[in-house]
A protein has these predicted regions:
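Glycine-rich phosphate-binding loops of nucleotide-dependent enzymes
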Residues: 2-269
Length: 269
């Protein structure tokens, strides 16, 4: 049963591709205001779960509820309008568009005037609306400290900055819940520290609930309120970072028989 304090609930979610079951009867809930991390080895089903939440995949079994309402009939665009934003493991920016224009794309579903009416009535409401959207985009640019590249083509930026631009575009949707798929993958230590700070600020200053997939266990343990562990499409553990850290099943899933404890791996980081 859905409750008001839970922004997202998953009940027995399963998805199968041919003979491969990517998710098997996964249930969990995310409370409003949490940073909820999903971890697990490669191929565990983490991105498949985000794809089910965002609407890219339809579960073959089970239900998803967002703010108490079933997502069964909701398209990707419907979910964006409801307040679900998303970044991707592989960057999906428009390389030849400026940083500012890439972020503006995230506000498309919030615009009352389409392109044609905007051209016909530019001097009226459409112009004012455009200015308001640009003001909000500029606020996001300031928040993520990318003012110095706002007019640069996104494709010319270093990888770490492009990841920030994609996060900015997800924020531009004005989501209540934001899904982050490996936001720190491929980054150096300094870039990871910056991105971790932005995720914390996104949660604490902007009040966004975050569901995050991340392989850097040090970051996960530092900034998460709750952690769920998947392995071969099944949930093997869920709890606070400390509870997950102490779980024997988690150590086996990550490290296998006879390897060093997960605690030692984290200390080494």
């Amino acid at each position: 049963m859905s409750t008001a304090e839970n922004i997202l609930e998953a009940s027995d979610v399963s998805i199968q591709f041919g003979g491969v079951r990517a998710l098997a009867d996964v249930s969990f809930h995310v409370e409003k205001g949490q940073v909820f991390s999903i971890i697990g080895p490669n191929g565990a089903g983490k991105t498949s779960m985000l794809n089910c939440i965002s609407g890219r995949y339809r579960p073959t079994k089970g239900q998803l509820f967002y703010n108490g309402h079933s997502l069964a009939r909701s398209s990707i665009n419907d979910r964006a309008r409801l307040g679900i934003g998303r970044t991707f493991q592989n960057l999906a920016l428009f390389s030849h568009m400026s940083v500012l224009d890439n972020i503006m794309v995230g506000r498309h579903h919030l615009m009352r005037n389409n392109f044609v009416t905007g051209m016909l009535y530019w001097v009226g409401g459409a112009q004012r609306e455009e200015q308001e959207h640009r003001r909000k985009v500029e606020d996001i640019i300031d928040f993520l400290e990318i003012q110095h590249v706002r007019n640069e083509p996104a494709g010319t930026l270093p990888y770490g900055l492009r990841k920030r631009v994609e996060l900015a575009r997800a924020i531009a949707i004005e989501p209540e819940l934001i899904l982050l798929d490996e936001p720190m993958a491929g980054m150096n230590l300094e870039e990871k520290e910056d991105m971790a700070r932005y995720v914390v600020d996104l949660n604490q200053e902007l009040g966004k609930t975050v569901i995050m997939i991340e392989h850097d266990m040090g970051v996960v343990m530092d900034i998460s309120h709750q952690v769920m562990v998947l392995d071969f499409g099944r949930k093997i553990c869920e709890g606070t970072p400390e509870e997950v850290l102490a779980n024997e099943h988690v150590r086996r899933a990550y490290l296998g028989e006879g390897d060093a404890p997960l605690q030692e791996e984290l200390v080494a980081q």
